[in-house]
C-alpha cells in the first residue's frame, strides 16, 4: 500500500509538471468572473443526480461503500475525468462499516431509539438507573449500576466516554437522552477505544429522557433494549482531481464528503458541498491558473472523517508542505440557513487555526460584504474534514449553513427564516433530499467557493509560507479541541456533532 501511495504522488506531480504549460493559452481565472459562471440550474441538476442514486436502491441513502455511494464516487470521477483538465484518481482504502437494528421498550411501551455507530449488540431487560451529572467521570455512576441500563444526559464528553464508563460501572447498556429538542444520532468514533470496552449504547430524545426520569423517580422502571449490530470491512474511495496547469508546489485544496448517514440521501449533508465543488471545478476548466487547484471528495466522513484522515496521513511531509491551504464545504444549503464562516482567527471561539486560517476567514468575510450579505462565525473545533489538515499545520477555512441547532432571533433578523426552528430540520434524517435545499444559500455559497478558488489560484501572497514557525503543534491543538465547549451556537453539524455532546 505504501508503494501504491508513492506511485500516486509521483505520477500526480509529474503529470502536473508535464502538462502544466499546455493550458497557458487560456485566460487567467479571475475572482470577479468565475463566480458569475456558477448557475443554480447546474447545482440543482447535480444534486438531483445524487438523490436519484440514493432512491434507485431500497436503502435510499448514500452510506459509504453502498451501491448509491459507489455511484456517487464513479459519477464524480467520470465528470472530472472527461474534462481533460484534471489529473484524476480514486484513492482506495478499507474501513469498517456498521449498521444496526434496534428496539426499546420501557414498562411495555415502545420508544424511538437510535443505535450509536459502533455500538455492540445487546438484548437486555433490566431496570433503568439515572447517572448523575453528565456521566463524564466515574464518580457520576451509581455504585449499584451492575446489570442495569444507564440513563445519561448528553453533554460535555464524547459518547464513547459515556459508553466506556457505563461498561466499567457494570451496566448492561446505556441510553443517552438529548439535551435539545428532537431525536439524536451519534457515533462512538471507532470500532474500539483506548479508553476501554464499550457498553451497548443508543440515543433517545430529550422529551423521552425527561419522561423516563420522572417514571424512575416514581418507582422501579424496567426497560428492554435490543440492538443487532452488523459490522463488515468495505473498500471505498476518495476522488482527487488536480489541475494539470498551475504550480504543483503551491496547491490550493478544497473538499467535501461524498457519503450520507443511513437515514437518508444526504442532499444537503453533504451533497450540497460536493456538487458545488464539482460545478466550480467544471467552470474552472475555461481558465488557466497560476497555482494548482486540487478538488478532494472524501469518503466515509460520517463514520469518523475516515477518508480525509486517510488521505492526509498518506502524504509525506514534502507533499503536505505543497498544500498551502484547505477549504471545507459541508452543508452549504440548509433550508433555514445562516451564512457561517469558520473562525480561523479564533476571535469568536478562542481556537485559532494554523497561520493563514485568519486570512481565509477574512477573504470570505470580504466576499459576503461585497455582495451585501451578513455572516456570522462558526466554531472551528476540527471535527469536520478539515481536522486532519489543521492537525498537520495546514491553514483551513470554509463555509457552513447549520445543522440541528435552533435558529436564534438574532439570526432570523440577519438571514430571514424562522427563529426557534432548526437550521436544518432534516439533518441526518430521511427528509434530507432535494426539497431540503435552500436555493438562495446554495447559489450564494457556491459563488463564494468560486471566488475563493479564483483568488487563491491567482495568488497565495496573503497566506504565510509553510514552515516550522507557522505550524500549530498537534498536541496543543488536540488539547484545545478537547477543551472547547460544544454549545450549539455555531450550528454544529455533521460528524463533529455525532461524537460528543
UniProtKB/Swiss-Prot annotation:
Function recorded in the entry: Extracellular aminopeptidase that releases a wide variety of amino acids from natural peptides and contributes to pathogenicity.
Source taxonomy: Eukaryota, Fungi, Dikarya, Ascomycota, Pezizomycotina
Protein name: Probable leucine aminopeptidase 2
GO biological process: proteolysis
One GO MF term: metalloexopeptidase activity
Any Pfam family: Peptidase_M28
Record's GO cellular component terms: extracellular region
Entry keywords, A to Z: Aminopeptidase, Glycoprotein, Hydrolase, Metal-binding, Metalloprotease, Protease, Secreted, Signal, Virulence, Zinc
Segments for region (Disordered): 480-501
Residues bound to Zn(2+) 2: 269, 302, 428
Broad class of the protein's primary localization: secreted
Cofactor: how bound: Binds 2 Zn(2+) ions per subunit.
Domain PA: 119-216
Amino acid at each position: 500500500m505504501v508503494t501504491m501511495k508513492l506511485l500516486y504522488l509521483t505520477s500526480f506531480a509529474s503529470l502536473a509538471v508535464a502538462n502544466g504549460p499546455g493550458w497557458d493559452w487560456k485566460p487567467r481565472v479571475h475572482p470577479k468572473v468565475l463566480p458569475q459562471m456558477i448557475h443554480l440550474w447546474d447545482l440543482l441538476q447535480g444534486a438531483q443526480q445524487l438523490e436519484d442514486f440514493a432512491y434507485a436502491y431500497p436503502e435510499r441513502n448514500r452510506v459509504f461503500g453502498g451501491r448509491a455511494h459507489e455511484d456517487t464516487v464513479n459519477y464524480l470521477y467520470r465528470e472530472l475525468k472527461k474534462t481533460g483538465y484534471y489529473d484524476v484518481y480514486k484513492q482506495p482504502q478499507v474501513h469498517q462499516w456498521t449498521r444496526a437494528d434496534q428496539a426499546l421498550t420501557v414498562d411495555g411501551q415502545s420508544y424511538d431509539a437510535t443505535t450509536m455507530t459502533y455500538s455492540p449488540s445487546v438484548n437486555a431487560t433490566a431496570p433503568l438507573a439515572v447517572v448523575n451529572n453528565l456521566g463524564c467521570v466515574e464518580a457520576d455512576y451509581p455504585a449499584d449500576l451492575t446489570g442495569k441500563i444507564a440513563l445519561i444526559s448528553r453533554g460535555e464528553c464524547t459518547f464513547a466516554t459515556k459508553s466506556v464508563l457505563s461498561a466499567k460501572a457494570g451496566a448492561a447498556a446505556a441510553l443517552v437522552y438529548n439535551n435539545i429538542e428532537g431525536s439524536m444520532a451519534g457515533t462512538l468514533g471507532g470500532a474500539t477505544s483506548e479508553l476501554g470496552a464499550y457498553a451497548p449504547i443508543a440515543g433517545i430524545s430529550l422529551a423521552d429522557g425527561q419522561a423516563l426520569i420522572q417514571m424512575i423517580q416514581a418507582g422501579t422502571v424496567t426497560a428492554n433494549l435490543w440492538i443487532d449490530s452488523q459490522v463488515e470491512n468495505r473498500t471505498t474511495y476518495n476522488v482527487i482531481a488536480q489541475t494539470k496547469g498551475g504550480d504543483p508546489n503551491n496547491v490550493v485544496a478544497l473538499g467535501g464528503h461524498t457519503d450520507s448517514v443511513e437515514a437518508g440521501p444526504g442532499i444537503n449533508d453533504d451533497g450540497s458541498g460536493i456538487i458545488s465543488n464539482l460545478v466550480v471545478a467544471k467552470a474552472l476548466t475555461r481558465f488557466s491558473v497560476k497555482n494548482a487547484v486540487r478538488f478532494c471528495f472524501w469518503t466515509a466522513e460520517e463514520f469518523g472523517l475516515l477518508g480525509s484522515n486517510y488521505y492526509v496521513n498518506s502524504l509525506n511531509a514534502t507533499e503536505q508542505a505543497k498544500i498551502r491551504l484547505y477549504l471545507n464545504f459541508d452543508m452549504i444549503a440548509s433550508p433555514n440557513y445562516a451564512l457561517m464562516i469558520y473562525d480561523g482567527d479564533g476571535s469568536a471561539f478562542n481556537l485559532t487555526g494554523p497561520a493563514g486560517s485568519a486570512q481565509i476567514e477574512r477573504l470570505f468575510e470580504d466576499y459576503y460584504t461585497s455582495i451585501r450579505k451578513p455572516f456570522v462565525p462558526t466554531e472551528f473545533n476540527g471535527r469536520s474534514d478539515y481536522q486532519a489538515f489543521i492537525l498537520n499545520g495546514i491553514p483551513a477555512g470554509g463555509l457552513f449553513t447549520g445543522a440541528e441547532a435552533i435558529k436564534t432571533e438574532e439570526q432570523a433578523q440577519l438571514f430571514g427564516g424562522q427563529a426557534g426552528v432548526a437550521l436544518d430540520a432534516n439533518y441526518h434524517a430521511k427528509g434530507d433530499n432535494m426539497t431540503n435545499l435552500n436555493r438562495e444559500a446554495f447559489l450564494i455559497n457556491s459563488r463564494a467557493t468560486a471566488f475563493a478558488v479564483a483568488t487563491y489560484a491567482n495568488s497565495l501572497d496573503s497566506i504565510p509560507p509553510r514552515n516550522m514557525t507557522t505550524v500549530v503543534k498537534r498536541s496543543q491543538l488536540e488539547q484545545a479541541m478537547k477543551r472547547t465547549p460544544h454549545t450549539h451556537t455555531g450550528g454544529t453539524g455533521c460528524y463533529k456533532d455525532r461524537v460528543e455532546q
